[in-house]
């Protein structure tokens, strides 16, 4: 299984689906499922049952939250010009491996 090139905190753009064109920050990455959770994208509605809390508090009702999106449906946004780009890797002179933009060559 290949490693996930998109990390938590990256800004990505949705390239297909109902939220196409939307830009958002990656909240969480799920490498074992090849999915990412993007802030404000792929919102779903959950109906939760009322649960009795220990102190008499009740929580329940309709909740909207983000659902994971497959990494093939998002592209990372190049920080230099704000356009979506593919990701490559480069090894610096000191031996560290860094992610770079394929379009502009800038480090991500």
Swiss-Prot record:
GO annotation (BP), single: translation
InterPro entries: KOW (IPR005824), Rib_uL2_dom2 (IPR014722), Ribosomal_uL24 (IPR003256), Ribosomal_uL24_CS (IPR005825), Ribosomal_uL24_KOW (IPR041988), Translation_prot_SH3-like_sf (IPR008991)
Keywords per UniProt: Ribonucleoprotein, Ribosomal protein, RNA-binding, rRNA-binding
UniProt-recorded Gene Ontology molecular function terms: rRNA binding; structural constituent of ribosome
A GO term from the CC aspect: ribosome
Leader peptide range in chain numbering: none
Coiled-coil ranges from the UniProt annotation: none
SUPFAM superfamilies named in the record: Translation proteins SH3-like domain
Gene3D superfamilies: 2.30.30.30
Protein function: One of two assembly initiator proteins, it binds directly to the 5'-end of the 23S rRNA, where it nucleates assembly of the 50S subunit.
Family assignment from sequence similarity: Belongs to the universal ribosomal protein uL24 family.
Quaternary structure, from the entry: Part of the 50S ribosomal subunit.
HAMAP family: Ribosomal_uL24_B
Protein's recorded name: Large ribosomal subunit protein uL24
The encoding gene: rplX
């Amino acid at each position: 299984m290949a490693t996930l090139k998109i990390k938590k905190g990256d800004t990505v753009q949705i390239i297909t689906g109902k939220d196409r064109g939307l830009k958002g920050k990656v909240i969480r990455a799920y490498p074992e499922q090849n999915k990412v959770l993007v802030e404000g994208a792929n919102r779903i509605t959950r109906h939760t049952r009322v649960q009795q809390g220990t102190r008499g508090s009740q929580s329940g009702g309709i909740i909207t939250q983000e659902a994971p999106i497959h990494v093939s449906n998002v592209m990372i946004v190049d920080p230099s010009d704000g356009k979506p780009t593919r990701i490559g890797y480069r090894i610096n002179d000191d031996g560290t491996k860094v992610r770079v933009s394929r379009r502009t060559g800038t480090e991500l």
